[in-house]
């Protein structure tokens, strides 16, 4: 019994070990709920399952319906497991049967192989026995057989030598020149060695005469212009085997090739598409040059000693001479390529040209095909950049011409003049889009699929000095220079530049300074990541140039608009007789025109510039004039001006007043806002008005007319300037100067002035 129980324990231990390996396979070795579940005696799937405890627990904890459900579930599981077991048994049985058949077949095959190996061993033994018998039989005659074989070989060679002249003639008659040369080459050393023997000397003489005739025939074929390159190579190879001078053959071979290459160059003189031109040149000249070089090297470079060096030097000199003409034609054709419509055509042509030069560069490194081709590509790229720069300049000039025409075009009934904001936006967008288009076209030179893009120039200098500095920076400087020219020279047909164009260009340059320049250069640097560390123009320098240009244009705009208003005021003062004029009843039309023009300028400037900052206005800004040049003050101030008793006192009073008044800088720097621009124009206009008044003499009514006009200007101009006191002071000086120059200074009542201005 103890033995039986021990056996059962061993079996249980084996089962537990197998079960443990299964748990290890399914990853259930960790401590936790899985282990606790298998130790539970009521777990059907556990190792320690106890049926009695399981049934007792079910009866205690479950109702009848639950027991029936458990029964149904267990029946279903049993059926499922039974079905799976049957399937496994069937599959394993099939595999077992298949394995049995395979083993049986292998046994049969090995048995056949054993029989064949036995037969092979028997045959090898028989062969070995026969070989030993033959060797023992022929051992005594081996030396005799070897001697006879040598004699036989010698007789065959002698027979070949005696038959050689006849064979050579036969080959020449059949045109088998290569075979004849081969025969003679094999026998030449033997004939030369035994030429002292009469029989061999005669054979040698006959052979030399025959081969001399063959050499003449080969030279004629070699010099025939209609001979193909293959025929030339064969002729040269045979002549070299006939020991013709190598240097003469080199010269003749190259001279024959010169004609073919020169004909290709003459064909390239015809004009055509650049890509077609490159294809024709590469397919004709370059291909034939490569073929000629390869044939030449295969014929002459294999010669030993100095012959190979001499041949290589001749080939290098020959190709350098002819390639110079070819490269000149290519550069001449590239200079004719002025069309900028499709830059990809030029880049493709240059890429193909550069690629096709790699073959001759490898064949003949001394010619420098690759170096010279790269130089041509670089010069073509530089020329293209210069063309694009000029195209950008022309495009900008064309845009400015369109803007000028739009500004100068007569207004049609029912159609408004184009707004400056729209013209500025259109001009800026057009120029920017054109720059992007040019950058995209130029970027083709650095594309990854272009062969020459990996050259140092296109990785460095082309990007930084060519595109950035030579194209973009140069164009930005050109824009500023072109804009400045409108301030320095008269326009077309001697007319001055339209003030609106000056204003528009000043805003364009200001926009360039604030954002456009940085955007363009950033875009350029991102597209052309060069490896060159050469110094470049900083963005701040270009922005300063653009701002300076904008300031110059704006100052010129203020001067030109101030000049327009000043001309009206000057003519209105100079063409009127102020002494005998009638009593004023209304505001002069020129003053209304001045207010209208300045209002129009205000609207025009407001389309492009911000409002700006004004000083705080007083509540009675439009009426402050009355307190300054009122009738009572004028009477007290200037009543004694023209009496001989007190001229010095009046002048002293006027000068003292000027000392305490704030100095007005007429041509001060204009700020980039509407208020500053209008202030500058009004200062120039009123200063001109003041100087013209100082040069005239006035009567009573002339002074009163000036009073009315100045009051009208004060009513409307104060709102345009940054400081209303500026208008106040200038108009006060105008009225004061008129009163000072008046023969009968009797000012008009303030209430009357007010009524006239309101009515006007």
Swiss-Prot record:
Please give the superkingdom of this protein's source.
Eukaryota
Q: Give the GO terms filed under biological process for this record.
A: endocytic recycling; lipid transport; protein transport
Q: Which keywords fit this entry according to its UniProt record? A: Coiled coil, Endosome, Golgi apparatus, Lipid transport, Protein transport, Transport
The terms describing its cellular component in GO are: EARP complex; GARP complex; recycling endosome
Provide the coiled-coil residue spans: 97-127, 374-395
- State whether keyword Coiled coil applies: yes
InterPro entries from the xrefs?
A: Cullin_repeat-like_dom_sf, EXOC2/Sec5_N_dom, Vps51
Location within or outside the cell: Golgi apparatus, trans-Golgi network; Recycling endosome
Where would one find the signal peptide in this protein? none
- Principal location listed in the UniProt entry: Golgi
Note the SUPFAM superfamilies from the entry: Cullin repeat-like
What does the similarity note say?
Answer: Belongs to the VPS51 family.
Q: How does it assemble?
A: Component of the Golgi-associated retrograde protein (GARP) complex Component of the endosome-associated retrograde protein (EARP) complex.
What job does this protein perform? Involved in retrograde transport from early and late endosomes to the late Golgi. The GARP complex is required for the maintenance of protein retrieval from endosomes to the TGN, acid hydrolase sorting, lysosome function, endosomal cholesterol traffic and autophagy. Acts as a component of the EARP complex that is involved in endocytic recycling.
Q: What protein name does the entry list?
A: Vacuolar protein sorting-associated protein 51 homolog
């Amino acid at each position: 019994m103890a033995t039986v129980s021990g056996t059962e324990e061993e079996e249980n231990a084996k089962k537990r070990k197998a079960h443990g390996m299964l748990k290890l396979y399914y990853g259930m070795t960790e401590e936790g709920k899985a282990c606790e579940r298998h130790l539970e005696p009521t777990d059907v799937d556990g190792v320690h399952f106890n049926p009695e405890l399981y049934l007792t627990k079910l009866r205690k904890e479950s109702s009848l319906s639950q027991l029936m459900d458990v029964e149904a579930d267990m029946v279903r599981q049993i059926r499922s497991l039974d079905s799976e077991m049957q399937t496994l048994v069937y599959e394993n049985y099939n595999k077992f049967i298949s394995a049995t058949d395979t083993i049986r077949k292998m046994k049969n095959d090995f048995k056949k192989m054993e029989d064949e190996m036995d037969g092979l061993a028997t045959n090898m033994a028989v062969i070995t026995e026969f070989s030993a018998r033959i060797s023992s039989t022929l051992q005594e005659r081996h030396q005799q057989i070897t001697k006879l074989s040598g004699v036989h070989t010698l007789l065959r060679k002698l027979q070949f030598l005696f038959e050689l002249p006849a064979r050579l003639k036969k080959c020449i008659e059949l045109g088998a020149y290569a075979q004849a040369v081969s025969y003679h080459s094999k026998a030449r050393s033997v004939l030369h060695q035994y030429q002292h023997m009469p029989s061999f000397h005669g054979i040698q003489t006959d052979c030399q005469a025959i081969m001399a005739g063959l050499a003449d025939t080969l030279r004629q074929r070699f010099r025939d212009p209609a001979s193909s390159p293959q025929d030339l190579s064969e002729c040269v190879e045979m002549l070299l085997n006939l020991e013709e001078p190598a240097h003469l053959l080199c010269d003749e071979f190259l001279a024959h090739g010169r004609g073919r290459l020169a004909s290709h160059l003459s064909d390239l003189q015809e004009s055509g598409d650049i890509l077609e031109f490159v294809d024709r040149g590469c397919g004709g000249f370059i291909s034939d040059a490569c073929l000629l070089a390869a044939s030449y090297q295969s014929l002459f470079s294999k010669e030993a000693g100095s012959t190979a060096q001499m041949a290589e030097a001749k080939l290098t000199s020959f190709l350098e001479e002819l390639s110079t003409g070819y490269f000149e034609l290519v550069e001449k054709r590239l200079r004719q390529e002025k069309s900028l419509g499709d830059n990809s055509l030029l880049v493709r042509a240059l890429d193909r040209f550069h690629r096709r030069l790699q073959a001759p560069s490898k064949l003949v490194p001394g010619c420098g095909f690759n170096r010279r081709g790269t130089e041509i590509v670089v010069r073509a790229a530089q020329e293209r950049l210069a063309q694009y720069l000029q195209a950008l300049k022309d495009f900008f000039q064309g845009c400015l011409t369109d803007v000028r025409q739009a500004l100068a075009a007569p207004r049609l009934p029912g159609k408004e003049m184009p707004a400056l904001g729209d013209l500025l936006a259109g001009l800026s967008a057009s120029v920017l889009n054109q720059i992007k288009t040019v950058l995209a076209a130029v970027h083709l030179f650095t594309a990854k699929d272009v062969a020459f893009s990996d050259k140092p120039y296109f990785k460095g200098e082309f990007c930084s000095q060519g595109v950035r500095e030579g194209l973009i920076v140069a164009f930005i400087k050109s824009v500023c220079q072109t804009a400045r020219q409108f301030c320095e020279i008269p326009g077309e047909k001697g007319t001055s530049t339209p003030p609106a164009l000056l204003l528009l260009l000043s805003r364009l340059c200001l926009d360039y300074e604030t954002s456009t320049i940085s955007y363009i250069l950033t875009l350029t640097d991102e597209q052309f990541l060069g490896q060159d560390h050469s110094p470049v123009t900083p963005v701040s320098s270009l922005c300063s140039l653009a701002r300076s240009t904008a300031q110059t244009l704006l100052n010129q705009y203020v001067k030109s608009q101030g000049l327009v208003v000043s001309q009206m005021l000057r003519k209105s003062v100079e063409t009127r007789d102020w002494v005998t004029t009638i009593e004023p009843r209304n505001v002069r039309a020129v003053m209304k025109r001045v207010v209208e023009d300045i209002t129009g300028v205000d609207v025009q400037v407001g389309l492009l510039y911000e409002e700006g900052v004004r000083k705080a206005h007083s509540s009675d800004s439009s009426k402050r004039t009355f307190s300054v040049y009122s009738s009572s003050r004028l009477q007290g101030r200037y009543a004694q001006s023209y009496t001989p008793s007190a001229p010095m006192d009046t002048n002293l009073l006027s000068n003292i007043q000027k000392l305490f008044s704030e100095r007005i800088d007429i041509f001060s720097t204009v700020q980039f806002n509407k208020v500053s621009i209008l202030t500058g124009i009004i200062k120039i206009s009123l200063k001109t008005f003041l100087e013209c008044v100082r040069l005239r003499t006035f009567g009573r009514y002339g002074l009163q007319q000036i009073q009315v006009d100045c009051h009208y200007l004060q009513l409307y101009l104060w709102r345009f300037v940054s400081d209303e006191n500026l208008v106040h002071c200038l108009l006060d000086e105008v009225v004061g100067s008129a009163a000072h120059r008046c023969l009968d200074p009797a000012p008009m009542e303030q209430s009357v002035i007010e009524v006239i201005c309101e009515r006007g």
